[in-house]
Amino acid sequence: MSIASVASVFKGEHAVGSKVTVRGWVRTRRDSKAGISFLAVYDGSCFNPIQGVVPNSLDNYDNEVLKLTAGCSVVMTGDVVESPGAGQAFELQVTDIEVAGWVDDPDTYPMAAKRHSIEHLRELAHLRPRTNIIGAVARVRNCLSQAIHRFYHEEGFIWVSTPLITASDCEGAGEMFRVSTLDMENLPRTDAGKVDYDKDFFGKEAFLTVSGQLNAETYACALSKVYTFGPTFRAENSNTSRHLAEFWMVEPEVAFANLNDIAGLAEAMLKYAFNAVLTERMDDLTFFAQHVDKTVIDRLQSFVSSDFAQVDYTDAVEILQNCGRTFEFPVSWGIDLSSEHERYLAEEHFKAPVVVKNYPKDIKAFYMRLNDDGKTVAAMDVLAPGIGEIIGGSQREERLDVLDMRLAEMDLNQEDYWWYRDMRRYGTVPHAGFGLGFERLVSYVTGVNNIRDVIPFPRAPRTANF
């Protein structure tokens, strides 16, 4: 007898007639007049539960099996048999069942068999992974995460753990969470009446990071190819389906690389990750196609078989101005493209993923390399049909004099970036990288539109439960 996951039984890894033990939670129980109960038991290893056929000859049939309800946990031992029922290849002829945990009051169990709205499930984030939709999201999220790590490992990248607590603002945006151990009821003050951060834990102002990019650049300038994969934080007071206060980012940095190199890397990474999901998680994708977004499988298959289009920002603006479409936000050179503009380009004009390159410098960050025209920077966005921007990246400014000029233009203090400037003083090198918002990727793959539903415990304005 061996411990078996439900997935391993369905994959045929246990011979018919072999005895296995499956451990999981009851989804449903159905009793027949012939004295047999049918238990649907799931363990999270795959989408479908396994059916356990439980005879009334078991000693605990009357006093335990017939009292099982949704959510009870069980340890079920039996023989693997081919299933006569539709939709599953194998089931378990149960010879022993142990109840590991009961549901106190089945009538008030929040995850009973009835269907809940996804909005309601957000209020029950500790229980929602027991539902079909959130369980499927979790498996797809894991698959994408593992695929991204595999991709970079196979490409010779080194994973770098960048700090979550920082004193620098990568984006120059100012929307950062402050980290402090000062007594909020009795803040120390300077002679000028300002908060005296010299008395704080780090002896200066500190924040939760908005990006690991600047730190990753320092390692790329020594190890050639690196990436980060971890949480980032934005104190942006936005209550929308596209914003989180805490989310995960994938950020590769490559030395001796230009914008075209990094665009090719982005395309290869996305296709690798999507192929992994199509190969490994078709059971979950089928559920999403049936119940969430019928286009998810076709969209991923189309994505991996498409060549990415490329267009300069200036040409993209001209396309949008001449397309005959009236947009909610009018298009002119110098604006940051909105979601409606991005989706038109990807879905209607190019009908494929598209890389928009060379944006106006005034709408981009200080670290992006200034182009020879003096007006644009070597920045890119990858736009995907169905969602718009999914990746943003750039060639980094490796020239110290130009970097200093950009810092001054954006009223950023050179002294705060002394270590970042050092990289341009000691063996500077052209380099490039991008950032991928991981939750946006999971949302795109699953069709689950609100990114609060693709991260286990969402953090948003006035939302920090659990």
From Swiss-Prot:
GO terms for cellular component: cytoplasm. The keyword ATP-binding applies. It catalyses: tRNA(Asn) + L-asparagine + ATP = L-asparaginyl-tRNA(Asn) + AMP + diphosphate + H(+). SUPFAM superfamilies: Class II aaRS and biotin synthetases, Nucleic acid-binding proteins. Keywords: Aminoacyl-tRNA synthetase, ATP-binding, Cytoplasm, Ligase, Nucleotide-binding, Protein biosynthesis. Transmembrane segments: none annotated. The keyword Disulfide bond does not apply. Its EC number is 6.1.1.22. GO terms for biological process: asparaginyl-tRNA aminoacylation. InterPro entries: Aa-tRNA-synt_II, aa-tRNA-synth_II, aa-tRNA-synth_II/BPL/LPL, Asn-tRNA-ligase, Asp/Asn-tRNA-synth_IIb, NA-bd_OB-fold, NA-bd_OB_tRNA. It is found in: Cytoplasm. Pfam families: tRNA-synt_2, tRNA_anti-codon. One of its GO terms (molecular function) is ATP binding. NCBIfam families: asnS, PRK03932.1. PANTHER family: ASPARAGINE--TRNA LIGASE, MITOCHONDRIAL-RELATED, ASPARTYL/LYSYL-TRNA SYNTHETASE. Homodimer. Belongs to the class-II aminoacyl-tRNA synthetase family. This is Asparagine--tRNA ligase. It comes from Shewanella baltica (strain OS155 / ATCC BAA-1091).
